[in-house]
């Protein structure tokens, strides 16, 4: 049980996909201008990364490995993620049309989010079991969501701040992301996993 908790904390804080592995930077920068959009994108990404990790592990273990067609891993995983994203897109459209409108093109682009594909490929490369893959996917998604929501809250405050003209927009956003990354480096000694 402790191993699973350490895995979750490790991927959530210490090995965060956005701030440490630099995966998922496109939605991180693109959707984080408003807090409500970041929360919605975080929930959708959490759903996709968790289910994608589960289904990809099952497909790898019960189809790709037994049939010795490992060269189709990436293609199979992208297909699984596309199906999960389409399901989540239909769900968000039905439950919250306003959130669906706010997320716009970023919702279907979850399929090509490198953090989503990265968690699936890292699960296979790290030889995780089913439960570990699920925890790794959920922890990675929770870390992605946490960082995106924190970043969106900071960006909303920066939008009303008096920032010198050369630093407005993407410049201050990248500086802020760098400072967040430095802050998360403080968690490095927390988990030795």
UniProtKB/Swiss-Prot annotation:
Stretches that traverse the bilayer: 5-25, 39-59, 62-82, 102-122, 134-154, 171-191
Sorted alphabetically, the Gene Ontology cellular component annotations on this record are: plasma membrane
**Top-level EC class, please?**
translocase
Q: What is its EC number?
A: 7.-.-.-
One Gene Ontology term of the biological-process aspect is: electron transport chain
Name the membrane topology term.
Multi-pass membrane protein
Q: Which organism is it from?
A: Pectobacterium atrosepticum (strain SCRI 1043 / ATCC BAA-672)
Q: Does the keyword Disulfide bond apply?
A: no
- Any idea where this protein resides? Cell inner membrane
InterPro entries per the UniProt record, alphabetical: Ion_transpt_RnfA/RsxA, NqrDE/RnfAE, NqrDE/RnfAE_oxidrdctase
Q: Which family does it belong to?
A: Belongs to the NqrDE/RnfAE family.
Superkingdom is Bacteria
Leader sequence range is none
> Mind telling me which HAMAP family this protein's record contains?
RsxA_RnfA (MF_00459)
Q: Which UniProt keywords apply?
A: Cell inner membrane, Cell membrane, Electron transport, Membrane, Translocase, Transmembrane, Transmembrane helix, Transport
The record's note on quaternary structure and interaction partners says: The complex is composed of six subunits: RnfA, RnfB, RnfC, RnfD, RnfE and RnfG.
Q: What does this protein do?
A: Part of a membrane-bound complex that couples electron transfer with translocation of ions across the membrane.
Name of the protein in its database record? Ion-translocating oxidoreductase complex subunit A
